[in-house]
Amino acid sequence: MRYYTTLTLLITCMVIGLTGCRRDGIPTGGEGNTTEESKQTDLRILEVYYAGSEYSRVVNGQRFGSDYDDDAFIKIYNPTKEVKYLDGMLIATGSLDPAANIEVTATDGSSSGTADYYLKNFLVGSMLLFPGSGTDHPVQPGTAVIIAKKAIDHKAAFAKELGEDVGSYDLSKLIDLHQAKYSWTEGSGEIWVHEVFNASGIESSEEAANAWDPEEMSPFSISGKMALALIRPTVEINKIKEAFLQECKLPASDRGKAVYYRDVYFKSTHHSSRQVGLLLPNDQVIDAVVICPMKEKKMQILNLSLDKGFHGVKQTSEDKRPTYAGKSIVRKWDGKGFVDENNSTSDFEVKPVNPTTTIIRD
């Protein structure tokens, strides 16, 4: 009997082969031990710190608090077993507000019907471009990088700016980002991830070129009501820009066939509006998260394959500053890997900001 038992165990171990077998006969790999992280094939958004922190000042015995949002950042993580490169990648914000009670229409006519192109593509509101020729900006397996609004020690910089008046201020909650390698503000950080497109406030095709003009575009920012995406485009950004600028000159009747340019029409209960947008294919989006107060989402602004949910550090827009200051939305760790089911409601949680590239698994 012992001979057959031993033989059976040996055969079992041989069958599972590549998955491994412990000395006691229990498999060490295989489907039962597959983690979410092991299924991920590209970079992921790990943390988004967008609502900022706070500082206070005591005047005549009274404490007055203030917002501070120059310390925003995005943390990107490599869950794979191979080096990934940021060169030529885009960080993009969506053009639609998930908390808005609106309907996107096909044209500016109130009875033109609902449009769904923004679900078939990522409708870009603004975007940053990583520099590099292909292998200049690696992210090693199991490591993270921070892309900061300003890669500085915010407490030290603000204290220096205040000078002799610093004694009446409490700056203890401001964070140190001086070690962040990447920054979207020129002059801070080792590498400038510069803004290449921003359609904010641009409402017509005649003004569309301004979305690509550094002198005209609004500064890149992360709000509490938007989609945020990491995009690996298959077409060089200069070619996208060239095509967009040609398409915006098409007759209005032909613009619906454009690849990149889009007149975005939407209506609410009381009025209709128009803005300019840039379309990029969903299959070039390698990760996305919808940011929204937890009790305010009204509109699905991304294809469900990109994000079925949403997350935010606030419950409502009226939350008091102390309830959200110094907090991020962070991808959950399930004990095996960082969760990624393309559902930000369950994939993310609210945690105190971690302004370092140290990976916290808890």
Predicted regions and their residues:
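Bacterial N-terminal signal peptides that target proteins for export
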Residues: 1-8
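C-terminal motif of bacterial Sec signal peptides marking the signal peptidase cleavage site
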Residues: 17-20
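A structural motif detector for short, solvent-exposed N-terminal "entry" segments of globular domains
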Residues: 23-100, 198-272, 333-335
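Residue-level detector of short, conserved catalytic/binding motifs and their immediate flanks
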Residues: 43, 72, 87-89, 143-145, ...
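Acidic glycine-/aspartate-rich tracts in secreted/extracellular proteins
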Residues: 80-81, 150-154, 234-236, 282-285, ...
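Intrinsically disordered, low-complexity Pro/Gly/Ser/Thr-rich segments with frequent PxxP/GP/PP motifs
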Residues: 101-157
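Acidic, glycine-rich loop-and-strand cores that form catalytic or ligand-binding grooves
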Residues: 165-317, 324
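Extracellular low-complexity, O-glycosylation-prone Ser/Thr/Pro/Gly-rich "stalks"
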Residues: 301-362
